Amino acid sequence: MEKVSVETLIKDLNLEVIVKAENNKIDITTSDVNRPGLQFAGFYEHFAYERVQIMGKVETTFVEQLPDEVLAERADKFFAYPIPCLIVTRDLNIRQEIIEAAKKHDRYLLRTKEASTKFINRLINYLDEKLAPQITIHGNLVDVYGIGVLLLGESGIGKSETALELVKRGHRLVADDAVEIRKIGEDKLQGSAPEIIRHFIEIRGIGILDVKTLYGVGSVRNSMSIDLVIQLEEWDEDKYYDRLGLEDEYIKFLDVEVPKLTIPVRPGRNLAIIVEVAAMNHRQKQMGYNAAHELNKKLLKQIGN
C-alpha cells in the first residue's frame, strides 16, 4: 500500500506545525479528508479517523462557542483516535484545549493560511498523485503535439534515438529508459522519469546526454499523461502489419487500456516522422475523425453503386 508521511506533507504543502508528533507518527494512506464538526459535537459513529482531518471556519466557529471543560473532554476523545493529523485552515485561532489534547496524545496539529475549499482541493490532488498505484517499465516517454507517446521495444531497437530526434524537432522528452507510470483517477495514466535520471538520455556510442542543457528548458517536462503506446519491433516479413488502421489495438497498464500501435523498424524508415504522424492521427481520432473509417465508407459506397 502506498503511503505519505505527515512530515512529507508538511514540507510539500508548506504547513505550519503547531504540535509535532514525536513517537506516535501515523502515515496517510487515503486521499479522502474528513471535517470533524460532528466529532466535536460528540457524534463518533462512522468516524473516518484514518483520513486527514480538516477544520475550517464552520468547525472553528462551533468550537469557539464550547465551554472550556466540554471542549477539553471532546478534544481529548477526538485525539485519542489514531488520526494522521488535524489541519486548521485560514490561519484561524486554535484554542488551547485542542493544543493540549494534541500534545497529550502525540498527534500532529497543523495550520495553513489557505481557505478551506482551495486547500482541500490542493490536498486531494496532491495525495491522489502520491498515493496512486505505480509501476516502472522500460521505455521512453515523449510529449508529441500534446500527446503523451510511450515508446516500447527491445533494447537497441532505436527508442532513445527516436526520442532524441523528436526533441530536435521541437517536442519534449519526459523519460528515457525507465518510465514510472502512476494511475491517476479511474482511467488516466501519468508517466514520469525517476528523479535521479530525469532529463537525461542515453545514446549508444555517445553516452549520457543532458537534454535540458543541450536543448533548453522547453525540450523537457517532468510528467505527462500516457495517451498512445508505440511498440517498435524488427521488421518480420512473415508477420501481418495493419496497413489501413481499421483495427484498434490496446495495451493495459494498472487495469487501464491505452491505444497501441506496432511499428516495424528497418533501415530507411524515419521513425521520428512516423511517431509525429501517429500522434497527430491519434489527436484527430480524439476529435472524431478517423481517416481509415472515412476511406472505408467511400469504398463501400462506391462498391454499392
From Swiss-Prot:
Biological process per Gene Ontology, one example term: regulation of carbohydrate metabolic process
Region (Important for the catalytic mechanism of dephosphorylation): 264-269
Gene3D superfamilies: HprK N-terminal domain-like, P-loop containing nucleotide triphosphate hydrolases
CDD domains for the chain: HprK_C
Entry keyword Secreted: no
Binding site for Mg(2+): S160, E202
Cofactor: Mg(2+)
EC top class, as a word: transferase
GO molecular function: ATP binding; magnesium ion binding; phosphorelay sensor kinase activity; protein serine/threonine kinase activity; protein serine/threonine/tyrosine kinase activity
EC number(s) recorded for this UniProt protein: 2.7.11.-, 2.7.4.-
Function in brief: Catalyzes the ATP- as well as the pyrophosphate-dependent phosphorylation of a specific serine residue in HPr, a phosphocarrier protein of the phosphoenolpyruvate-dependent sugar phosphotransferase system (PTS). HprK/P also catalyzes the pyrophosphate-producing, inorganic phosphate-dependent dephosphorylation (phosphorolysis) of seryl-phosphorylated HPr (P-Ser-HPr).
Domain comment quoted from the record: The Walker A ATP-binding motif also binds Pi and PPi.
Entry similarity comment: Belongs to the HPrK/P family.
The protein's name: HPr kinase/phosphorylase
Annotated organism of origin: Caldanaerobacter subterraneus subsp. tengcongensis (strain DSM 15242 / JCM 11007 / NBRC 100824 / MB4)
Gene from which the chain derives: hprK
